[in-house]
Every structure is written in C-alpha cells, then in structure tokens.
Amino acid sequence: MNIDRNRLIGSVIFIFILVFIDQWSKYLVVKYISIGTEYLSFFGDFFKIIHVRNTGILFSIGANINSSLKNLFFLVIPIIILVFVFCFILKETNKIARIALILILSGGIGNIIDRLFRPLGVVDFLDVKFFGIFGLQRWPTFNFADSYVVIGITLFIIYDLFAKNKSTDL
C-alpha cells in the first residue's frame, strides 16, 4: 500500500486533536459535575450539560448484558473495525471521505478509551430537548465522540450518494 506521508501525518494530527477534545471535555465533566446532576442549561431547557454514564452502546443498548459479551461486542469488535477504518483513511484520496472516516475513527477511539479506563461507563454530558419527536422528549445524552461518529457517518453517506461518482478527488 502506497501511503502519502503528508496525508498520514495530517490524519494522525486531526485524529489526535479530536480525541483530545473529547477526552478533555469528559475529564472536565467527571472532575466538576457529580454523576446524575445538571450543570448548565441553555435556551431554557433546550440544551443541558449533565453528567451521566453509559455502560451500553447507542441509547444504552446492551447495558445489562454479561460483562464478557460486553467486552467482546463493545471493545474487541470495535477495535478491529477501527483498525480497518484507519486503513481506509490511509488509502482514501477523496478529502471529504477521508474527513468522514477520521471523524468516525476519532469518535470510536474516544469511546473505547472510556470503556477501557472509566469503569462506571462512557461519560455522556450533552443533553438536547427533542420535542416529542419519535416519542422522545429529550434526545439520549451523548458526548463529542458520539457526535463525531454521527457527523462522520452522515458526511460519508452524503459523499457516497452525491459526490463519489462526480469526482475522484475533491
């Protein structure tokens, strides 16, 4: 595999910065906000910063499964997937697709760090009102890593649907 050194260095720096922002924000939440408490509210109760922990995955799915299965499904398999994502980043020549993959990888790394080093679970702290859409008054609490993954997947889907066949290198 022929790897462009500048692309590799740029990607690693971008990943490092995103993971640092995620972990620093979680560190501040853990240090200054007790679990289960609200710290700040913006625009009435539209946006809140609160401290909760998630031992499952998206929407706390799997929070109550056996710890051996949890390690397999929430650590081992995601790490393997992230290795493949990193390989795709190194081979990808399209900037939009590469940024999307970097966002996905950075979010995955951020949450895996939590799973490895925070026994109480992944730190979630961003809480947004959802106005009853899909029956939810509030969107499930999330963190920057979760946002990176969602934005990355969305960007990649948009790229794949609309830009992929129009240009090989944006």
From Swiss-Prot:
NCBIfam families found in the cross-reference section: lspA
Species per Swiss-Prot/TrEMBL record: Borrelia hermsii (strain HS1 / DAH)
Functional summary from the UniProt entry: This protein specifically catalyzes the removal of signal peptides from prolipoproteins.
Biological process annotations from GO: proteolysis
Principal EC category: hydrolase
Disulfide bonds: none
InterPro entries xrefs: Peptidase_A8
Similarity section: Belongs to the peptidase A8 family.
Localization in the cell: Cell inner membrane
Catalysed transformations (reactions): Release of signal peptides from bacterial membrane prolipoproteins. Hydrolyzes -Xaa-Yaa-Zaa-|-(S,diacylglyceryl)Cys-, in which Xaa is hydrophobic (preferably Leu), and Yaa (Ala or Ser) and Zaa (Gly or Ala) have small, neutral side chains
Designated name of the protein: Lipoprotein signal peptidase
Lineage: Bacteria, Pseudomonadati, Spirochaetota, Spirochaetia, Spirochaetales
Keywords for this protein: Aspartyl protease, Cell inner membrane, Cell membrane, Hydrolase, Membrane, Protease, Transmembrane, Transmembrane helix
Gene name tied to this protein: lspA
Enzyme Commission number(s) from the entry: 3.4.23.36
